[in-house]
Amino acid sequence: MCREAFSLVLAVCCAVALADPARVKRRKPLTANVGVVSVGLDTYWRQCPGLYDDMLKKADVFEKRVEAHGVKVTSFGISDNPGKAASLIPAMKSADLDLLFVDMVTYATSSTFAPFVRELNCPIVLVALQPDSRLDYEHATIYKQLLNDDFCSVPEFTGVAIRYGRPVADVVIGKLNGDAKAEEEIRQWCSVAHVLHDLRRARIGLMGHVLEAMYDMQVDPTAVSRTFGCHVALCEPDEIMPFYREPVAADVEAMKKRILDFFDTPDPVSDPWTEKLTAKDLEVAAKAACALEKFIEKRNLDGFAYYYEGEAGSPTRELVTNFIVGNSLLTSAGFPMCGEFDLKNCVAMMIFDRLDIGGSFAEFHPIDFDRDTVLVGHDGPHHLNIASKKPVLRSLKKYHGKPGSGAGVEFSIKEGPITMMSLGLKADGSFKFIVAEGESLAGPIPPTGNTNTHGRFPPDVRTFLRKWSLEGPTHHFALGVGHHAAEIKKLGRALGIETVVVTEGR
């Protein structure tokens, strides 16, 4: 290879490396328990020889399609009479389902479905995917009609579910093959199943107290458990301190190497509160990160919201104010951590992570009226897997608005579509998803040791921020890549949570 060609290849490789920073490996794989039951009418099998076998073939196509989306599928066969429907309930309950697809392979009476609505606690999605895009009218037969009668009983089923007081979560309508829109709906529901699977099994730690006097942070842990299914485990700083006070030297050295391999540590630029990462701040960050990992393993946690100050100059103050690096690594690995005691946003970040779209801790920073953008970011924690390039660590001589000093994380998220969601609380105590879709734009960010991204939201920054604020959000929100309001609306239906997308109908 000539020198010029080699130089070109090297330049391209370097550019790719900068554009695609190393990813933090997920601690646990995404999964969900998804059931599929087909429905039909046993009278047809006697009248139309071969129809039952054709129904099984249709069901098999759909089940394989669901399996392709990273979920564990349990098939319950065809429910074709009231007795068969009732007999399936024990198996469905033992499968611990996160979601049930009801495959409407042909017309079925609602008695083949009603027991599922009455007995199961998971969301139910009706799927009507007919094999032919239309009947061959000149050569049509009753057999062919029944083979394509997937939608026929959908209104009957949805009406009965409403009368039971438990409406179905959704109806997917389309063609069995070659229908990208229907396939996307199925994919989205499997993503929602990932969220539901982990939410209702999660143990989220809660430590300390609300940062004085952020009223919007206050939330009832019982309401969180009732709505999302997760258990809120109450924790204390003294549970982490033994791991910090007596660290394993080899673990700390390995963590320091991991941190330095993952982050850049540039010289300070314009902010006098920042300096190049010091050896002391690296040591403290590594010790705190190791202590955090041992603590969450001991308590068997899946997320952690915290705020604590401790006595000035104490080891406790040093520990609890230096979680930022460790919690960013954990958040990126699928373990959401939320500062300022924001349990609601910890749930929002878990939702985004299980949708596999990131889930950075964020709030609004100054508006850029010249670019028609608003800076979105925070002082930690952050989902490093959605960074636009290698993230930066800076030593901060003090944290603005709170005690302590230490390493701070700085980066912008990837350019392109973004989604954000705040988990708000209404006056009646119920939760509300407040969602927006926008764009992450390239642009300079302040070198302050905090994350910042230029976010542009329609129709313009002033109108968007006013509409967002009037929906009553928590001032924190989860920030992710891609446009995913559709999945969040589905999740809202599954959980019975009001969902408002402020950038819709703009």
Name each model-derived stretch.
Residues 30-34, 70-73, 133-270:
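Cap/lid and interdomain-hinge subdomains that line or gate substrate/regulatory clefts
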Residues 51-67:
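Short catalytic helix/loop segments, enriched in acidic residues and glycine
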Residues 115-140, 145-153, 327-340:
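Short, acidic/small-residue loops that bind anionic groups at enzyme active sites
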Residues 97-106, 125-127, 301-307:
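Periplasmic-binding protein-like
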Residues 256-349, 353-354:
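Long, internal scaffold/assembly segments composed of regular secondary structure
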Residues 85-97, 114-116, 289-298:
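Short, well-structured alpha-helical segments in soluble
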Residues 328-448:
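C-terminal catalytic subdomain
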